[in-house]
Swiss-Prot record:
Name listed for the protein in its UniProt record: UPF0688 protein C1orf174 homolog
Basic and acidic residues biased stretches: 46-63
InterPro entries the UniProt entry points to: UPF0688
Record-stated family: Belongs to the UPF0688 family.
Length: 205
């Protein structure tokens, strides 16, 4: 009898355990069925919220990288241009230095026409281009003095100091000039008198 009771108790306890396990499984399955889609929806919302942020961050990173590349390229081009400018200015310094030496020694270059001029005349037109851009024939706006032809036309040959023109009657004295002047006046008066006499004679006729 005792053995049967013990066996019945064991069976009952086993049944209760099985029922509790089955209830737990069923409850877990029910929770999975009910909360599963909600969790999936929440996770999908989180991914949707995170995706634009990630896209914005990626776009910002791309923009920054593009800006850095552009800045690097501009810096490289500027450095290359400066290097090229230095290379171009170095060989051109030698002729100017030679011209400076020549001007110090008091020598000038002779052109094909035989007119000598120094290197300063070549630099003056460049200054004129900077100063006289309005094309006015006067030196300054407030002055009445005309501009030299060399500055106006930017020609080095016209800027040369030409010798003064020799007058053709340089040997004539003042007395001779006065005599000629008085003679011319007398001739004009005689012509006027003759013309008046002619008019009077015509009126009488």
């Amino acid at each position: 009898m005792r053995k049967r009771k013990l066996s019945d108790r064991v069976r009952c306890s086993a049944r209760l355990k099985n029922r509790s396990c089955s209830g737990a499984h069923s409850s877990s399955d029910h929770e999975a069925d009910t909360y599963g889609p909600k969790k999936k929806a929440v996770s999908s919302k989180n991914t949707d919220k995170k995706s634009p942020k990630k896209l914005e961050n990626d776009e910002k990173g791309l923009m920054e990288s593009d800006e850095q590349e552009f800045i690097n390229k501009t810096d490289n081009t500027a450095s290359n241009e400066s290097n090229a400018g230095n290379v171009n200015t170095c060989p051109s310094a030698s002729p100017f230095s030679d011209l400076n030496e020549v001007s110090r020694n008091g020598l000038t270059d002779d052109s094909e026409d035989g007119v000598g001029f120094s290197h300063k005349t070549s630099s003056e037109p460049s200054k004129v281009r900077e100063v006289y851009l309005n094309g006015s024939p006067f030196v300054d706006e407030d002055s009445n003095q005309p501009m030299p032809l060399g500055l106006f036309f930017e020609n080095a040959d016209l800027m040369q100091d030409l010798p003064p023109a020799v007058p053709c009657c340089a040997s004539m004295s003042r007395r001779e000039f006065r005599n000629l002047h008085f003679r011319a006046k007398e001739e004009e008066e005689d012509d006027d008198d003759d013309y008046a006499d002619g008019l009077v004679n015509e009126g009488n006729i």
